[in-house]
A protein has these predicted regions:
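Membrane-embedded or membrane-proximal helical elements that form or frame transporter/channel pores
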Residues: 63-98, 102-104, 250-272
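Terminal transmembrane helical anchor/hairpin motif
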Residues: 198-292
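Alpha-helical transmembrane segments of multipass membrane proteins
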Residues: 57-61, 135, 139, 143, ...
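Hydrophobic alpha-helical transmembrane segments of multi-pass membrane transport/permease proteins
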Residues: 45-67, 88-94, 204-211, 275-279
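Helix-loop-helix units of permease transmembrane domains in multi-pass membrane transporters
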Residues: 101-134
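Aromatic- and glycine-rich beta-strand/loop motifs that create alpha-glucan
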Residues: 2-49, 286
Length: 294
């Protein structure tokens, strides 16, 4: 029996001898890449047009509100009201950003490459979700900071006035976080169902806009209870209901009217918002566990 005659050739490859980063670094890299993707950073100029157009619009609106306030000396729009008024724009922002985060990977078939590394199955969707939440929060919170800085410069109450403005800003930022959590969880779940970005974008817009007529129909029924609970039927009005309940005068200044007429069902809206986000996140994780098992 002849001996083996095979030869191993050294063609110059060198083993990696550096530090092997763990799960936290992998998650951080996915999160940072997702955040950059949302705003088109590191991508073509075409990918930057829409996200930065939206950023420009909301910043311009905030600057305009600040300028008007400096002239008339009165609050034109509270920080929480600003988040409400920009929600329609956030819908389209999510419809473009969410498919970029997940639909492209589904269509190109690169998920097996992600999961071939020591990456827990839940980390991929959670990193993408956190990136989208952060992007929406920055989109709504950044202009609020512009409004705050303008108000701080024009106040005639010194540091006391600046402190009062800060106390108004913080609930506004928390409210922006609620918008971000609800919109991102729904948008990413819908986008994860298809690898085609156009279908994903259309589905996201449909979920937010087609639920609005349901609210309108329920709100004109002859039952006051149904009228006050009608706003649970749409994500946008659900968040508005939570804001009306939790923020009160910070969202609807006394004497100006407005807000969502939820009656005494504020806690119901709060619980519904938490359950909605939790359900969307659970379904998103389940979706990627199925994808990883293929």
């Amino acid at each position: 029996m002849s001996e083996p005659t095979g030869v191993i050739h050294d063609i110059g490859y060198q083993r990696y001898i550096g530090p092997r980063l763990g799960r936290r670094h992998v998650f951080g890299a996915l999160y940072l890449h997702g955040l950059r993707t949302v705003f088109g950073l590191g991508r073509t100029a075409k990918a930057k047009i829409f996200p930065w157009l939206v950023v420009g619009i909301v910043t311009l609106v905030a600057a305009g509100i600040t300028a008007v306030r400096s002239q008339i000396g009165e609050v034109v729009m509270t920080y929480a009201q600003f988040a409400d008024s920009m929600s329609w724009l956030v819908i389209f922002f999510v419809a473009v950003a969410a498919p970029e985060l997940v639909s492209r990977d589904l269509r190109s078939g690169v998920l097996p490459l992600y999961f071939s590394r020591p990456l827990p199955r839940d980390d991929y969707p959670l990193a993408k979700l956190l990136a989208l939440v952060s992007a929406i929060w920055l989109l709504l919170g950044g202009p609020q900071l512009v409004m705050f800085l303008g108000a701080a410069f024009i106040t005639d109450k010194g540091m006391r006035g600046v402190w009062d403005e800060l106390l108004d800003l913080l609930p506004g930022l928390l409210y922006a976080g609620l918008w971000a959590a609800v919109f991102a969880s729904i948008g990413l779940l819908v986008a994860s169902l298809t690898g085609k970005r156009a279908f994903a974008a259309g589905g996201i817009v449909a979920v937010f806009l087609m639920t609005t007529p349901i609210v309108g129909t329920l709100s004109i029924l002859p039952s006051r209870t149904i009228n006050e609970l009608a706003f649970l039927a749409s994500p946008s009005t659900l968040v508005g209901g939570v804001g009306t309940w939790a923020l009160g005068d910070l969202l609807v200044p006394e004497g100006r009217g407005g807000g969502v007429p939820i009656g005494g069902f504020g806690p119901v809206y709060g619980v519904a918002a938490v359950l909605l986000v939790a359900a969307c996140v659970a379904l998103l994780l389940l979706r990627y566990r199925k994808v990883a098992a293929r």
